[in-house]
């Protein structure tokens, strides 16, 4: 059945085009998106990307890394970064022409192992460094024309010396090239160096360039071309025709003389090179000038030093020699002994042909020869130099004694005269010998006239190298330092003097000596100064610490001894007051407070009760009641000031006695309660006369002054304690009154009481 007009076969592609369309669809589906305003052609197996005149400021980062050909021409890319072409191992052709590239990062093309053509022309490159083109091992075409390149490093082309075929460095500012690297480009076909500032080509540069077919040196500053077998290939005969070679060197200021005669003899056509010099050949076509006119002029010396130059020994002298010729001659100098002079520590030849001798010697006396040479010949001119010797300080003796021949100045020379002479050896003395130094002495050398200096030579038995020391002629001793310990040394002293017969410096052996240095010192060496200082500091610190510890121990022992003595004194005698265990005070009707106070060292007299009759005890209680009422009245009259008496037990009393000794306590109303029993020990203020209270010394326990009294309770004499007017009942408790001597009448029993400030405490608060 034939297909209808609307059959699906009308919309299906032809069978022959189906594989091609599938291939295009597969390539498009696998490829990355094309950068904006760029044209991408993904025709397998080639991926081409064209981004010309798109205004790019840098290399787009979205470029497919599988691209084979990339053209980024006519943009504004200013720099090539390291990451711009990273991992583009399939890139074969890269064009960056007509941009503003001024910087190329090191290793920017390191991943382009398959790159064959690199176009960087019409940019702003100023130099080509050795690390910029690294990694281009398969490069065939390198186009760097129309830049601002002034310098090309010698290692810039090392990566592709054996593979490059086309090198273009035209329209730059090059004054020189690494000609040695260019000579190793064995596969080079085209070398374009036109419109630069090159003025010299190294001889033998093109010897190995057998495949070179085009050399363009147009518009440079070349004056001549070195003869090279490269230019003679087209003239060689034989069954094999020569390789065609095109050499262009027009626009150079060629100097047409005999040095370019080899080039004139070549058969060339349609070349319009002209001559710039000499004057009679200016602006004439190079190939139209007859060979007879390519002439050279031999050198002519136009200026030289006078026929004779006088100079004092040791001073400098300059010998001038100028020559003219075509080509410009080169000047050399020859010494009086026939040596060709060059630049050394004593002589220097300038570029204009002047010879400078910085230090003249007597051997410089004679005729120096100036030689000027070029391709046409050479010219010579002699210059005589007369060196005047230095005058001697003392005139030589009229008849000097006969001397042996001057010996060698080297101690290592065998058979030196006087070296083994016993007389000379006795003249030299080695004194003050140590492991690293020795002092050498020798007598004055009167028979030798005009001694300039002494030379000391010595070497070790384990080392054949000589050590030289030059010392003044006035010295007769020399200290040799830096010697090795335990070694044998040979030492000789030589006198350097003026030989009157030859007018040259001569040497004579003064004497020789052999000695052996002392052995190594003991392995235990004294401590160095800084170590010794540290040890002294540690020792002094230890002494100080030990002294402090001893002082502390003594203080502790003393404190313990005195503490034990005080306790024994308290327990055994009545001269030391007992330690206070409680302090009872009352202020303005407040409750009793207790505080501990340190014992006072003051001595008081204590009155102990031996036997108290019942009648006396009743009278004492009656007197207490009377005094209590009087105290209440006085307290009210003083504006609320109150006084309290506390009976403090001593350490000798037992617990029951302490409870029995507790004195009457004052109630909230200010009345004293009756005592439970008579106290065996009473703490009273010494002295019979009552004392007026001192308001300026009153203290109050209302605040936190209890702690103050505890930490700062200093002992006070009983006579400084003020008696309160509320205590007269203590004076009459025994039926008697206190006398001037402090005795109290207690019936038939009288005793002496010792009072302490801690056993009787009086407080008065206003």
UniProtKB/Swiss-Prot annotation:
Glycosylation sites: 87, 343
Residues in compartment: Extracellular: 32-536
Highest taxon, organism lineage: Eukaryota
Transmembrane segments annotated in the record for this chain: 537-557
Residues annotated as signal peptide: 1-31
Residue span, Ig-like domain: 299-386
GO cellular component: cell surface; postsynaptic density membrane
One GO term (biological process): regulation of postsynaptic density assembly
Post-translational modification: Glycosylated.
PDZ-binding, short sequence motif: residues: 763-766
Protein name: Leucine-rich repeat and fibronectin type III domain-containing protein 1
Protein species of origin: Mus musculus
Gene: Lrfn1
